[in-house]
Every structure is written in structure tokens, then in C-alpha cells.
Regions:
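Conserved SAM/SAH-binding beta-strand->alpha-helix loop
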Residues: 52-54
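Conserved class I S-adenosyl-L-methionine
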Residues: 20-29
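Gly/Ala-rich phosphate-binding loop of Rossmann-like dinucleotide-binding domains
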Residues: 38-39
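Short SAM/SAH-binding signature in class I
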Residues: 87-94
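Glycine-rich SAM-binding Motif I of class I
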Residues: 31, 35
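S-adenosyl-L-methionine
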Residues: 60-85
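Conserved SAM-binding motif I beta-strand of class I
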Residues: 45-50
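Conserved alpha-helix/loop element of class I SAM-dependent methyltransferases that forms part
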Residues: 4-20
């Protein structure tokens, strides 16, 4: 089984995002935050967004390993510049820069 170990910073972000119907994780990098929230049933769905395809590919692989890729959409974009961004009821921008 896939195991998520969030850093204290990401764990704090996760607490604020709990209960979201659609979370946008901007600058998702590895995708640990939305994956953890989905695995624990704390959110309904998420968009993992990153401007770089390499980290986004890593997030996609982690989601497949965790078995939650059906509830996670991947967008290679700048910030919230993806279709349907206005439908997100929670946004996390953590660890950028």
C-alpha cells in the first residue's frame, strides 16, 4: 500500500484543505498533498497543477501507485491557468520557490 508522509508544513496545509470538494494544488511537484487528502477521504477530488512537466509526471506516477488517479486531474500550466479553475473551492500554493 502507498504510504504518505507529509512534512509538518504540508500536513498543516492539508488540515486547512480538508472538506474541499475540488482542491487545486498549485505547484504540486510530487503530488503528496492531494494524494494524501484523497487517500484519507478528506477531499472529493483535486487538480494537481505544475508548470513543469517533469514534476507533474512524478505526481501522476505517485497517484497511480496510491490508486487515486481517478480523482486527481493533472494540468501542466501556470498557476490557476487551467479549464475549470473557478470550480475549485480550495487552493493550496505551498513550497513554490
Amino acid at each position: 500500500m502507498y504510504k504518505t508522509n507529509l512534512t509538518p508544513r504540508l500536513a498543516l496545509c492539508a488540515r486547512y484543505a480538508e472538506g474541499a470538494h475540488l482542491l487545486a494544488d498549485v505547484g504540486t511537484d510530487h503530488g503528496y498533498l492531494p494524494i494524501s487528502l484523497l487517500m484519507h477521504g478528506k477531499i472529493d477530488a483535486a487538480v494537481a497543477a505544475d508548470i513543469n512537466p517533469g514534476p507533474l509526471s512524478s505526481a501522476r506516477r505517485h497517484a497511480a501507485e496510491a490508486g487515486c488517479e481517478d480523482k486527481l486531474r493533472f494540468e501542466c500550466c501556470d498557476g490557476l491557468d487551467f479549464p475549470g479553475a473557478d470550480s475549485c473551492d480550495a487552493v493550496v500554493c505551498a513550497g513554490m520557490g
